[in-house]
Swiss-Prot record:
GO terms for molecular function: 3-oxoacyl-[acyl-carrier-protein] synthase activity. The keyword DNA repair does not apply. Belongs to the thiolase-like superfamily. Beta-ketoacyl-ACP synthases family. The lineage of its organism: Bacteria, Pseudomonadati, Pseudomonadota, Alphaproteobacteria, Hyphomicrobiales. InterPro entries: Beta-ketoacyl_synthase, Ketoacyl_synth_AS, Ketoacyl_synth_C, Ketoacyl_synth_N, PKS_Beta-ketoAc_synthase_dom, Thiolase-like. The keyword Transferase applies. Its main location: membrane. It is found in: Cell inner membrane. GO terms for cellular component: plasma membrane. Residues 2-401 form the Ketosynthase family 3 (KS3) domain. This is Nodulation protein E. Its EC number is 2.3.1.-. Keywords: Cell inner membrane, Cell membrane, Membrane, Nodulation, Plasmid, Transferase, Transmembrane, Transmembrane helix. It comes from Rhizobium leguminosarum bv. viciae.
Amino acid sequence: MDRRVVITGLGGLCGLGTDASSIWTEMREGRSAIGPISNSEIHELKGMIGTEIKVLPQHDIDRKQLISMDRFSLLAVLAAKQAMLQAGLSCNEGNAHRFGATVGVGFGGWDATEKAYRTLLLGGATRTELFTGVKAMPSAAACQVSMNLGLRGPVFGATSACASANHAIASAVDQIKLGRADVMLAGGSDAPLVWIVLKAWEAMRVLAPDTCRPFSADRKGLVLGEGAGMAVLESYEHAAARGATMLAEVAGIGLSADAYHIAAPAVHGPEAAMRACLVDASLNAEDVDYLNAHGTGTKANDQIETTAIKRVFGDHARSMSISSTKSTHAHCLGAASALEMIACVMAIQEGVVPPTANYREPDPDCDLDVTPNVPRERKVRVAMSNAFAMGGMNAVLAFKQVP
């Protein structure tokens, strides 16, 4: 039996807000969180901008747990707890083996790694903190979510750069469809506002000096940010049996690889992933009302994504609404497509397409309707989310209203 998978809870933190509701409110209105980075340890950067979570929400995680967590893991746990709360779920001895988690992480614990470097090489110490190794591993986020919520089913991480969260969600859907779990926490987390990470991205010459302007002719690159987004996924039967509110259904998944270049984008991979997603969801191109674009704000990525969208959707590419919410929350790497999942689900819930903020000049090479600067009321029955990662790893998800 092909089990349907629905979303019953959302959680998130990023520069826009510290829960899914506040993130969506800011995103919907096109209010960008991009601004100066306040971390005093970050210096000598050409562009000192990003999206930071200024103050974390109150939580019940004690100090003994916190010392074993890098920031990206903490963000994942906080988002997961929010999602479980909205879903009205909790783990116990009777159901824990049917609850699991997959968390996408792009970079992982570079904060712990950089602190170890400073301690050993600059401070002259002979050893690092006890938990440096386990704090830094990308899978730590999934481990910490499991331990903090008591999940004993399938638990693992997904690491595919900017597509990590979509790959994690896709994998979680598979666990439910295969009957290995009834409930999965899925999403992504990253905390890349660390000096060594920012310097690495600066070296690639892709960071914008001012802000992120996806699809605008005067765009100058991407902006990095920290954040996490998590969803509670359930089999339709499990959610219906307990009378849960179903926010959306995960209708389809499309995965592909460019097999082309470690950094440069290509058209054929994104095109293949979008086509595969439509087939998996049994959708026609005309069924998609809203597409949340990968839309990083770099010259090459936005142009190539536009071309891929035109190839897949044909004439409908000019009828559906498109936007890049990275213009508001920036590129949160492993968390990016998790935050964009929130945008898709809430667009379906409220019938509003969030805009592409900071847009100034039309680009003839990006000539689709990217919903510039102002939200648009529109019935959204189906929303698609693109995630195209460095190295050509592509993951596309389709979400739809629950009948």
